[in-house]
Regions:
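Conserved N-terminal alpha-helix of the aminotransferase class I/II PLP-enzyme fold
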Residues: 63-96
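PLP-dependent class I/II
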Residues: 3, 11-13, 18, 25-32, ...
């Protein structure tokens, strides 16, 4: 089969590849602790499940409007005002099956040969993949351990050229766990305002999972709502990964183009999932708060545990549920550490270079697992590292 050349530009998520290797070892009888997948280990809150079940019984089993059911778009707009302090109209909301389609559609709508897109590196690997697929040029914005994985904003203007059309932000950040402060977002906004045709895609999927600060959105800065596409969803905050539901909040001029891309690809998100999402946003938030409280305990457990292992350094994550320790002093590449920790220690984790060139020398561990399993993983990794 002769494939289109553009398929060579499409990357992947190695988390699922590592998961497959781990499952194969488990099938052979090896005990594996899973710290590779970025998925909450909690069930969807019961009132959300009940709303979804009732929606199915009430006949929400048909096509819905491509940009989303009116009741969900209205709920998202209300929630955005409450959480972000941004006056949002339902007409500026587009709902999709998962948040990735919003990323893809935005890059297909704005990216093309000759256009440059700035993105965080280390960062979610699909950013770079989608930028390349759109034909645009990926321009990495390095996140360094020495600054707690925050970008050096004094260098940002030097990355921007006349061809730069989009800057991708992710806060809290995957894989590093850093969270952009209000002051940092103000500085970015001031830089962006100096350029006429420059936009922000703000990935805020982890906005509810924070430990050291409240959530700040760059769209709330003066003059930035019309320059910002917010990307969010329900998978992380409400443990709804399998419900496949995300959304974008965007300038009105972009909505018809993103909607047309959705018409040509997914048609619409599942109607019953959307009714469940209304219950998620407008129902009790106790389960979310309890989940974040538990993640905070695990964050301390894993970061302190990793720092207790010889020659490993791990900055304290500020948000999300990932630790991103340095293994530079161990004499192994990130990929070698990933492979050997799986086979020799029985701990599944991800090589840092899966998140971009600046991730070499690091690994990512998800602490979306029990305290008991995290402690066992630390003990296994400690033994493995001491054996090197």
């Amino acid at each position: 089969m002769t494939l289109a050349n553009r398929m060579m530009n499409l990357g992947t998520e190695t988390a699922f590849e590592v998961l497959a290797k781990a499952r194969a070892l488990e099938a052979q009888g090896q005990d594996i602790i899973h710290l590779e997948i970025g998925e909450p280990d909690f069930g969807t809150p019961q009132h959300i499940v009940d709303a979804g079940v009732n929606a199915l019984r009430d006949g929400y089993t048909h096509y819905g409007p491509t940009p989303g059911l009116p009741e969900l778009r209205e709920a998202i707009a209300r929630n955005s005002q409450l959480v972000r302090g941004i006056k949002t109209e339902p007409e500026n909301v587009v709902v999709t099956p998962g948040a990735k389609p919003i990323m893809f559609y935005v890059l297909l709508a704005l990216g093309e040969p000759g256009v440059e897109v700035i993105y965080p590196n280390p960062g979610f690997p699909i950013y770079e993949s989608m930028i390349k697929f759109s034909g645009a040029v990926p321009v990495p914005m390095q996140l360094q351990e020495e600054t707690g994985y925050h970008p050096d904003l004094d260098l940002l203007p030097s990355l921007i050229t006349n061809n730069t059309r989009l800057i991708i932000l992710n806060s809290p950040e995957n894989p590093c766990g850093s969270n952009l402060s209000h002051a940092e977002l103000e500085k970015i906004a001031n830089i962006v305002r100096q350029h006429q045709n420059l936009y922000i895609m703000s990935d805020e999927i982890y906005k509810d999972i924070l430990y050291t600060d409240s959530h700040n959105s760059i769209a709330a800065m003066p003059g930035m709502s019309e320059r910002t596409i917010i990307l969010d969803g329900f998978s992380k905050s409400y443990a709804m990964t399998g419900w496949r539901l995300g959304y974008g909040i965007m300038p009105s001029e972009l909505v018809p183009h993103i909607t047309r891309l959705a018409v040509n690809s997914v048609s619409c998100a599942a109607s019953f999932s959307q009714i469940a999402a209304v219950a998620a946003l407008e129902g009790p938030q106790d389960d979310v708060e309890a989940m974040v409280t538990e993640f905070a305990i695990r964050r301390t457990l894993i970061s302190e545990g990793l720092r207790s292992i010889p020659n490993i350094n791990c900055p304290e994550p500020e948000g999300a549920f990932y630790a991103f320790p340095s293994i530079k002093n161990l004499g192994l590449t990130s990929s070698e550490f990933e492979d050997r920790s799986l086979r020799e220690a029985g701990v599944a984790l991800l090589a840092g270079n899966a998140f971009g060139e600046f991730g070499e020398g690091y690994v990512r561990l998800s602490y979306a697992n029990s305290q008991e399993n995290i402690q066992k993983a630390i003990e296994r990794l400690d033994k493995f590292v001491r054996s090197l």
